[in-house]
């Protein structure tokens, strides 16, 4: 069985849509960035840390998603004012979303990531406040969800599921590890 080390409902939905046999066991870790840590170094460190306790008999997968603008990481907002600040910063601009994938199986640890460009509408403070009140994006990096109707995303380039928080194109590259966990597969 696959063990998904994540609390994200979006990651759960994506794995369910792939018809995989998995269970959720999230690991709580300190997601603080280190001083002068490059965004991709941070992504790798956090994605692999989320793998948590290793089990040689199970396939463990973990993910982390970061929003990066001007080489600065925008994590999940801690409160309403921080969400406003992030969305004002992203308004009318383009940023990059990186999602990292940590995999542990048979004593081997691997990391891969994908990136997507996201273009935002130009929003005023009232539009931003209404969005936050309606969607409560406090569990999302950058304070937004690409899937939110009437959200701030104007367009994007790259993988939709990557922006949701699961780098599916990278996951597919490891199909030899996970194909036996397809429901109904006796391989």
Swiss-Prot record:
It catalyses: dTTP + H2O = dTMP + diphosphate + H(+); UTP + H2O = UMP + diphosphate + H(+). GO terms for biological process: nucleotide metabolic process. Pfam families: Maf. The record marks 10, 65, 147 as: Important for substrate specificity. Keywords: Cytoplasm, Hydrolase, Nucleotide metabolism. Its main location: cytoplasm. Belongs to the Maf family. YhdE subfamily. Nucleoside triphosphate pyrophosphatase that hydrolyzes dTTP and UTP. May have a dual role in cell division arrest and in preventing the incorporation of modified nucleotides into cellular nucleic acids. This is dTTP/UTP pyrophosphatase.
